[in-house]
Every structure is written in structure tokens, then in C-alpha cells.
């Protein structure tokens, strides 16, 4: 995988959180409907599974497998079969499963990037990464929980806007950390 600095990663994640929060708060009704529909959106599921599968293959390509080098092709076939099999046979909550795998891959990128940075503020991102891993595992084994969580978050427009405001605040924090702390 190409290397990225913690500053750039923080700014990218911050900009994404900020943009999503601003869009969701300005188009709350439409965004709320999108959020509610996401868990059962097959097209989003196919895309997220594809992105996750390619990303995982890229990670595996760069790994030193030492004693298991002979099995590299088998691992690649297994990853492809798992991704394709998920799309064919696990269509129920496919978007949630794809998002869960992607959450864990993003968490790996965050932890790998923050590992050797000197600033204690890196722990903000590392904490988020560990929460993403826990969430990813939880949503993988019980994907209906994301549907329930989204239903709770969108049940009241005021609550939805508060959650969007929290996302905006977090995005600003990550942008500021990327600009001023993680240089």
C-alpha cells in the first residue's frame, strides 16, 4: 500500500466527515432517507465488497508471508471467493457487511499510519480506529444492528441534525489536527 502521512490521512478523513455532515444537515430529509435505505442497498453492498476485496488483495500483495509464501495464491483465491460468494449468497444486509469490512481496513490504515508518530494526539485517531474495528466485527455478525442504529438516529429530525453536528465537529477536529499537530 502507498504510504500516507498522518497529517494527510487526518485531513482526508476530516474533510470527508465534514463534507458528509454538512451535506446531511443541509439536506436532512433526503439524507435521512438515504441513511435508512443504506443497510439493504444491494448496489452499495456490491461496491463496498469490491473496494474491500481489492484493498485486501493489495495489502496481501505487499505482505511478507515467510513460511506461507507457497499459499499466497490460495489466499488470493480465498479472498476472491469470499467476496464473490458474499455478493451471491449473502445479499441480506450486503451493504452493512461491505461497510463493516471497509471500516476494519480503514482502521488498519489509521493504526499503521499513526503507529510511529510522536504526537499524543494520534490517540484520537487510534481510538476511532479501535472503535471502527469493534463496530466492524459487531456489524459483520449482526448486521441488523446497523439498521437499528440508523433507525434510531433518523427517527427524530432534531436528533439527526445533532448527530450531523457532531460529525461536523469531529471533521473540523481532524482537519485541525492534520493542519497544525501532525506536521
What are these regions (language model features)?
Residues 173-183:
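Juxtamembrane boundary at the C-terminal end of a transmembrane helix
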Residues 7-11, 42-48, 72-80, 160-164:
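Alpha-helical transmembrane segments of polytopic membrane proteins
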Residues 11-22, 50-57, 77-81, 104-111, ...:
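Hydrophobic alpha-helical transmembrane segments of multipass integral membrane proteins
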Residues 26-30, 140-146:
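Short, proline-centered helix/strand-breaking motifs
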Residues 1-54:
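N-terminal topogenic module of multi-pass integral membrane proteins
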Residues 68-136, 147:
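Membrane-proximal helix-loop-helix units in multi-pass membrane proteins
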Residues 29-40, 55-67, 83-94, 149-154:
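Short juxtamembrane and helix-loop transition motifs at transmembrane-helix boundaries
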Residues 147-166:
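Interfacial loop-to-transmembrane junctions
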